[in-house]
């Protein structure tokens, strides 16, 4: 008697039918389209995207530690030190010993860095605004924010 072997493929649902796949490609494509436009505009302002991220994160604050800065920016820890060195060499940030913890340093914008923040941040917001408002209503933006935060949370807890 011969036992007919069932193929493994026939026992499983087709992976191409997974519902999340209909979202995956558009999500990634939207992200890359955003990066291309945003990065190009930031570079036209005379900054690299990591430099812009650090300046905008420090803007309107009293400064923060390196650890806080690395947690609040999208800049990797390995890149952050070099970015800060270059911004400090340009006179845009300063490093001040912390009063609370002598082992810690506070990074803050210099007056020149604050002036730059006040110039470039509104320009970037003004540049990006039509892309979002031309595609989504305010309610859709709120819904999208909620969904993206849920998705991020799902990836971070697993």
Q: Where are the model-predicted features located?
A:
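N-terminal helix-turn-helix DNA-binding core of bacterial DNA-binding proteins
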Residues: 32-76
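Base-recognition residues in the alpha-helical recognition helix of bacterial helix-turn-helix
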Residues: 25, 53-57, 81-83
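Exposed, interaction-prone assembly regions rather than primary DNA-binding/catalytic cores
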Residues: 142-158
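Residues within helix-turn-helix
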Residues: 66-67, 78, 85, 105
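Charged, amphipathic alpha-helical coiled-coil/dimerization segments
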Residues: 6-9, 35, 85-143
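A structural signal for well-ordered alpha-helices, especially hydrophobic packing surfaces
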Residues: 31, 117, 152-155
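N-terminal leader segment of winged-helix/HTH proteins
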Residues: 1-45, 142, 150
């Amino acid at each position: 008697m011969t036992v007919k072997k069932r193929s493994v493929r026939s026992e499983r649902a087709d992976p191409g039918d997974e519902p999340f796949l209909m979202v995956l490609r558009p999500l990634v494509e939207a992200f890359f389209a955003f990066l291309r436009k945003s990065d190009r505009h930031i570079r036209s302002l005379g900054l690299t995207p990591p430099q812009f991220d650090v300046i905008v994160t420090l803007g309107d604050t009293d400064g923060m530690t390196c650890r806080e800065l690395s947690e609040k920016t999208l800049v990797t820890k390995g890149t952050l030190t070099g970015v800060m060195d270059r911004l400090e060499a340009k006179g845009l940030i300063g490093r001040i010993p912390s009063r609370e913890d002598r082992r810690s340093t506070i990074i803050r914008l210099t007056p020149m860095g604050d002036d730059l923040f006040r110039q470039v941040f509104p320009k970037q917001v003004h540049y990006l605004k039509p892309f979002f408002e031309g595609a989504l209503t305010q309610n859709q933006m709120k819904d999208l924010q909620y969904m993206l935060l849920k998705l991020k949370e799902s990836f971070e807890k697993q």
